[in-house]
């Protein structure tokens, strides 16, 4: 007998879990279909393990770069990679248990397996069919790989989290935040690290101040940056090492090569054609602002839609979808404007709103006023390894409404959230000026710029 549900989510990542739990809280009969571990990319091979590794790299940097000038004997005999990975795994296991407990409390049926559409209301999982009035596609994304000879010798971000040991020489290929974060972590943990970017700098879509400062720090502290670097081939050598060959004739030999050139939607194995769901030329599911696909009763959230590929975005969109469908809020939807984001680089980056070039293009040069601050992060100021901290406010109009907030430096990852609330609420430069600073902090620079 075919089992019927009010709501089914395909994919047990951030968006699927958030949406299905919210629907179940409103009394809907729900099922979540996931073939792998709960939590999706974020928990298993993304945000969570990445942040653990970032913390580990920070600890090593604190010991070796800053500890001596603070008076500490920083002699360390060894670093145990296995201990770090075991601690990380235990933490992720606790998150899995938490998800299982919440889903169980909400009476959500968790079905282990791969789902495929039979038609717009029917799915096939493990040889059985199930139906639903509403179906959410939250299948996420996966790493992309270049089409070059020897590509199989490299690993991707998923593979990084499966490494049994930290190798001595590592190359990361990519210019986006994933590449920057991985290269920063590996460099911070002590490996000889190379970052290869196709054009003149990493993070080119960010405000120029961010990218320029990041390059400045990389040139001083690593990883070694290779610009205008287009991969041509990868050769595996007799000793097991890998040589990355570039189109311009340059090459670099390393022990491990990581592809971090972007991500693509994981929509190709669920038989969307049987349901009639439309995708764009890149394979992303086409949705409107309410997360509706072109087929009534089928929705999509998260990385498989090509929207902002961040965990909190998928969570927020998924919850709002369930509020609209099951809590009598017909206009509930996620506002995708002014979404804050942090890059866990070394040092961290925080940004929300328009970059300076975007603001000038949108409003005109005569309507834009920019405030900047540049200083040495206090944490590093008493050491020989001084690191810059730079901040920018982008304001428009006679009232100087703040439309962009950007920063790079120690603590930026934690301080941005509150300032993002202010920008979202329409704060002006005068509002910031009227706020008394907290001293001594880096955050005070945002309310004392002149």
Q: Model-predicted segments: where are they?
A:
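Glycine-rich dinucleotide-binding loop and its adjacent helix/turn
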Residues: 47, 139-192, 196, 224-225, ...
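A Rossmann-like FAD-binding core segment of flavoenzymes
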Residues: 109-112, 116-124, 130, 189-289, ...
């Amino acid at each position: 007998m075919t089992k019927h549900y009010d709501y089914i989510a395909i994919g047990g990542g951030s968006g699927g879990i958030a949406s299905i739990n919210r629907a179940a809280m409103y009394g809907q009969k729900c099922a979540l279909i996931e073939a792998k571990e709960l939590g999706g990319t974020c928990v298993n091979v993304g945000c969570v393990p990445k942040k653990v590794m970032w913390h580990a790299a920070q600890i090593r940097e604190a010991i070796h770069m800053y500890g001596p000038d603070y008076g500490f004997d920083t002699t360390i005999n060894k670093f145990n990679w296995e201990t770090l990975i075991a601690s990380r795994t235990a933490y992720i296991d606790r998150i899995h248990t938490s998800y299982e407990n919440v889903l169980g409390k909400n009476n959500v049926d968790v079905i282990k397996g791969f789902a495929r559409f039979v038609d717009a209301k029917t799915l096939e999982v493990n040889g059985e069919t199930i139906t639903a009035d509403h179906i959410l596609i939250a299948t996420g994304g996966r790493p992309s790989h270049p089409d070059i000879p020897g590509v199989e010798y490299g690993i991707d971000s998923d593979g990084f989290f499966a490494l049994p040991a930290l190798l001595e020489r590592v190359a990361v290929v990519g210019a986006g935040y994933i590449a920057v974060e991985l290269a920063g972590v590996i460099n911070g943990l002590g490996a000889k690290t190379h970052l290869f970017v196709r054009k003149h700098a990493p993070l080119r879509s960010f405000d120029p101040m961010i990218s320029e400062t990041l390059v400045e720090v990389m040139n001083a502290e690593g990883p070694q940056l290779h610009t205008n670097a287009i991969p041509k081939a990868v050769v595996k050598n007799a000793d097991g090492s890998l040589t990355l060959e570039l189109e311009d004739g340059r090459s670099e030999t390393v022990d491990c090569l990581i592809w971090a050139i972007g991500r693509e939607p994981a929509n190709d194995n669920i038989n969307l054609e049987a349901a009639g769901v439309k995708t764009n030329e890149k394979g992303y599911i086409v949705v409107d602002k309410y997360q509706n696909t072109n087929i009534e009763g089928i929705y999509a959230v998260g990385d498989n839609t090509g929207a902002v590929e961040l965990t909190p975005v998928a969570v927020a969109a998924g919850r709002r979808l369930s509020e609209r469908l099951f809590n009598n809020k017909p206009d509930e939807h996620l506002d995708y404007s002014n979404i804050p984001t942090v890059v866990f680089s070394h040092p961290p980056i925080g940004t929300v709103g328009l970059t300076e070039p975007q603001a000038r293009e949108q409003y005109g040069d005569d309507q834009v006023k920019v405030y900047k601050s540049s200083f040495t992060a206090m944490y590093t100021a008493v050491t020989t390894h001084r690191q810059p901290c730079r901040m920018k406010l982008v304001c428009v109009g006679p009232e100087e409404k703040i439309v962009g907030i950007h920063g790079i430096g120690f603590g930026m990852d934690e301080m941005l959230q509150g300032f993002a609330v202010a920008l979202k609420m329409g704060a002006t430069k005068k509002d910031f000026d009227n706020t008394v600073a907290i001293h001594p902090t880096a955050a005070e620079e945002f309310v004392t710029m002149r």
